[in-house]
UniProtKB/Swiss-Prot annotation:
Cited SUPFAM superfamilies: Cytochrome P450 (SSF48264)
Localization in the cell: Membrane
Membrane topology of the entry: Single-pass membrane protein
Record-listed E.C. numbers: 1.14.-.-
Name used for this protein in its record: Cytochrome P450 71C3
Reported cofactor(s): heme
Similarity field: Belongs to the cytochrome P450 family.
Residue numbers binding heme: C475
Superkingdom to which the source organism belongs: Eukaryota
Annotated GO MF terms: heme binding; iron ion binding; oxidoreductase activity, acting on paired donors, with incorporation or reduction of molecular oxygen, NAD(P)H as one donor, and incorporation of one atom of oxygen
Gene3D superfamilies with a match to the protein in the record: Cytochrome P450
Pathway participation: Secondary metabolite biosynthesis; 2,4-dihydroxy-1,4-benzoxazin-3-one biosynthesis; 2,4-dihydroxy-1,4-benzoxazin-3-one from indoleglycerol phosphate: step 5/5
Length: 535
């Protein structure tokens, strides 16, 4: 079973689905002896150098050649890791080998705090990945670049000039206009055929994509279908980045070098498409800036801001392209998937939806509003709580992007060697029964008490709740994503009543919440709902 799992991962990585059993067996026969020698050498080294040190965190039994502990992990990786920590771990820590890669699993608030606060200076780097390195112009981005001076400069640029509260707020009119387009289209669909279901997965995905494209490209975001093209290319990025990293598992022998070349070719080909498109839109912005005198304006989009600032930070145009790619990846699919899950949860919890609709509609009626605008959101506490609850149950990524320990350290009485991957299971922390009352239930009320309503829940300082991470690597675009999601959810509740297609009169019909593991959790089924304009 373990070898079959490795075989399926290899198929996904190189994009071929028809290897012969002979080819697969040949590959494994080449790899097995080498990996056994490497593991034996590593075990000997660890044994001789580890005398007198505290023990490693506990591990599951039965390490196998090549796959390590991967045979313990099913297709729902985040759930498998949660179960393994519960069975074999201690205080939320578990140490395992993913292939030949030592990996520290972090699955409790106290463990997360130890890694991302106490030892953040050691554990906040990123592991090297061949796909990410190529796709990011030799790791020129902010999300995957290792800790260091370059990362500090990119982070400073993003936080100061692109994603500050002031700059995010300056884009509010664009978000409001995109919401109006969605509301108008839904009204039209409901009027034409009151009982016809709408693919809300597509509606929400298109909306978040258009908001991001508009912020990055400005008024040209729909030119030549660019908004759609950027969305397609971003989805491919996610698939490439979540694919099996061959360099972690197979030694670099001449006979296996072909596999690495195939992966490099696939990623490089995709990068060329990105490069051509980014060159085109950047060139257009350069020409427009010449006409306007290169002066910075509040209405500047992300490309304008990069062009006015990149030389100040000593960046090249490749740095700019890599950072633009980060913006698309971080904002498009994450926001859409959380919105989709929020709507699905509300359909399964009608009491919550009615309470949310009552709050939004009472406020709108009092203020005589044609729509809920961003300036109104702070007056809607149950809306805020509902979004927090959706993010608790359905964080943008079930596992935070992998961290990397750059030096030996001691955590919770355990020796953590240098160079392991560190995976924080944010999904498991958000459902920890030791922390959350009825953790599997959708209960926004929990965020209206116990100080949650007054705290900055998204700051990463409360390690019970980490939808955007914590420490040095906390997501810099949290405010942008929240603004995008909250205004859409508010207006969907304000303007429409919602039904499930062919809904039973007794209300027992449930929307499936089954999800597929990946860099982000994607629902197994599209969300079809019937909108009815509220009276």
């Amino acid at each position: 079973m373990a070898l079959q799992a490795a075989y399926e991962y290899l198929q996904q990585a190189v994009g071929h689905g028809a290897w012969s059993s002979t080819q697969t067996l040949t590959l494994l026969l080449i790899a097995v002896p080498t990996v056994l020698l490497l593991l034996a050498s590593l075990a000997k080294s660890t044994s001789s150098s580890g005398r007198g040190k505290p023990p490693l965190p506990p591990s599951p039994p039965g390490t196998l050649p090549i796959v390590g502990h991967l045979h313990h992990i099913g297709p729902q990786t985040h759930i498998s890791l949660q179960e393994l920590v519960a069975k074999y771990g201690h205080n939320g820590f578990l140490f395992l080998r993913a292939g030949a890669v030592p990996t520290l699993i972090v699955s409790s608030p106290s463990a997360a705090e130890a890694v991302m606060r106490t030892h953040d200076h050691i554990c906040a780097s990123r592991p090297w990945s061949m796909a990410s390195h190529i796709l990011r112009y030799n790791t020129c981005d902010v999300a995957f670049s290792p800790l260091g001076e370059y990362w500090q400069q990119t982070r400073k640029l993003m936080n100061t000039h692109l994603l500050s509260n002031k700059k995010v707020y300056s884009f509010r009119h664009g978000r409001e206009e995109e919401v109006c387009l969605v509301v108008d289209n839904l009204r039209e669909a409901a009027a034409k055929s009151p009982s016809t279901a709408v693919d809300m997965s597509e509606v929400l995905a298109a909306y978040t994509n258009d908001v991001v494209s508009r912020s990055v490209l400005g008024s040209t975001h729909r030119k030549k279908g660019r908004n759609t093209l950027f969305r397609e290319m971003t989805m491919t990025n996610v698939d490439l980045l979540v694919g099996f990293n061959l360099e972690y598992y197979i030694p670099r022998w001449p006979l296996t070098d072909l596999l690495f070349r195939l992966v490099c070719w696939k990623v490089t080909r995709h990068l060329k498409r990105w490069d051509a498109l980014l060159e085109e839109v950047i060139h257009e912005h350069v020409e427009m800036r010449k006409l306007s005198g290169d002066k910075e304006k509040e209405s500047d989009d992300f490309i304008d801001i990069f062009l006015s600032r990149y030389e100040e930070y000593g960046f090249t145009m490749d740095n700019v392209k890599s950072l633009l790619m980060n913006v698309f990846e971080a904002a498009i699919e994450t926001s859409y998937l959380v919105l989709e899950s929020a709507m699905a949860e509300l359909m399964n919890h009608r009491r919550v939806m009615k309470k949310l609709q009552a709050e939004v509609r009472a406020y709108g009626a009092e203020k005589k509003l044609d729509m809920i605008r961003e300036d109104d959101l702070s007056s809607l506490p149950y809306l805020k709580a509902s979004m927090k609850e959706a993010l608790r149950l359905h964080p943008p990524g079930p596992l935070l992007l992998p961290h990397y320990s750059t030096a030996d350290c001691q955590i919770d009485g355990y020796h953590i060697p240098a160079n392991p991957r560190v995976l924080v299971n944010g999904w498991a922390i958000g459902r920890d029964p030791a922390v959350w009352e009825k953790p599997e239930e959708f209960m926004p009320e929990r965020f209206m008490r116990d100080g949650w309503d007054k705290s900055n829940s998204y700051s990463g300082q409360d390690f019970r709740y980490l939808p955007f991470g914590s420490g040095r690597r906390i997501c810099p675009g949290a405010n942008f994503g929240l603004a995008t999601m909250e205004i859409m959810l508010a207006n969907l509740m304000y303007h429409f009543d919602w039904e499930v297609p062919n809904e039973k009169e007794d209300g027992c019909w449930k929307v499936s919440m089954d999800e597929k593991f990946g860099l982000m959790l994607r629902r197994n089924e599209l969300l079809y709902l019937v909108p009815r304009a509220s009276s």
